[in-house]
Amino acid sequence: ALFMTSAQAEAGTGCPLSMTYSAVPALRTQPELAAEWEPLLVAPAYDGRLAVRDEKSSALCGMAMTEKQGGSDVRANTTVARPLEGAGGPGAEYELTGHKWFCSAPMCDLFLVLAQAPQGLSCFALARILPDGSRNAFHLQRLKDKLGNRSNASSEVELHGALARMVGEPGRGVTTIIEMVAHTRLDCVLGAAAGMRLGVAQAVHHAGHRSAFGARLVDQPLMGNVLADLCLESEAATVLAMRLARAFDEAAAGDERAARFRRLATPVAKYWTCKRAPAHAAEALECLGGNGYVEASGMPRLYREAPLNSIWEGSGSVQALDALRALARDPGGLDVLLDEVGEAAGVEPRLDAFVRGLRAELGDPDTIEARARRVVERLGLALQASLLVRHSPPAVADAFCASRLDGDGGLAFGTLPAGVDAGAIVERHRPGNDAGYSREATSSGGGELDVDAGA
């Protein structure tokens, strides 16, 4: 929740924050490195000095995986790692030579880097400043001129014999760094949900204070439909992001079932939530009319930020195929995820029918790769609907199931069916509504959402 709040205020800080905290699980595979760096990485202060580690009060950690010829196919990387002494191995020093096409937050003190060691692709920890105070052979070539997220620098880097230490086992670099990637994917989901919440806050606030044709915009039926639809998408994204975050915490505490849920739910949530963000931002901007197209409103920046989380840490197709890999490696993981969905079984007939159709689609393995996006989309919708049925007011769950599961809605935002209580849904999301996301905000039903996602 705190990450989402921060991301609404300034999205550019999300990347270095996410990478820094996500690096901790990967570093723990090499205990001596974790002992050196973890206290600095989790320190709450910011020390922006380019200084040797022992002089720092805190540190940031980035990662450098992507190369121009490989992109998401990191096994095609050509950066070479040569051991300085003997055969090398975990914790040993290496010289790294090569390039990295995308390296965000290049001011970081430490980077996790993938490079080809003699035994295969391996993970390395590369410090910007060496223990003797000299700069490592980590050379910035230029900063990327990006569509959005411009307050977070992204660079191209060349390594000319840069010194680094191996993290984890040789030849198992992807396995070592994948835990970091999983955590940054969670933050992509949180970031996308945060962007939707910001868009809703701006649109609802504007519509509540702007009058046209004799009435406030928020009181006009068609605008109410648009706003309610945006609110539904935002709330669905938030509850899914929070449920996934809970699974990460439970898995870290040793809950095997939570770990299996997390493995499949992460690419599902990353794909679906992040895919919805750009269209959501565009519609929220349009709610402000011409004023939304002006930089001073903040909406153009939100619009430019919106596609990024879908690209970072593996684009849409990468996530869909990763979900298929998770299904193939652990078929029981699907049962765990559907058990979560099934906690709402018998409450909402449209959800029950949707799940039956989903099971039928999953039963056709011959064409599933071509249908991967569709399957993952439907898994995401099923999870969102189940969470809303269990934790949100009936007005929200009913509108979501009608428009997303039952086909009683159009392809654009603002096409909710007749009978939806748009006013109640919008009021629930109005900035300054202290009731937040509690069920009591719009309903007399019992229970509250696990997390005050209204933040």
Predicted feature descriptions by range:
Residues 1-52, 104-105, 305, 312, ...:
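Internal helix-loop-helix
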Residues 91-137:
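A short core secondary-structure module
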Residues 132, 156-184, 201-218, 331, ...:
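A glycine-rich, basic-preceded beta-loop-alpha segment at the flavin cofactor/substrate interface
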Residues 134-160:
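Flexible, small-/acidic-enriched active-site or ligand-binding loops
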Residues 235-270, 286, 359-372, 376, ...:
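C-terminal helix-coil-helix/basic helical segment that borders enzyme active sites and/or dimer interfaces
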Residues 260, 271, 275-307, 313:
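Extended amphipathic alpha-helical segments with heptad-repeat/coiled-coil character used for oligomerization
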Residues 302, 306-345, 376-384, 392:
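C-terminal catalytic subdomain
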Residues 340-441, 454:
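C-terminal amphipathic alpha-helical interaction region
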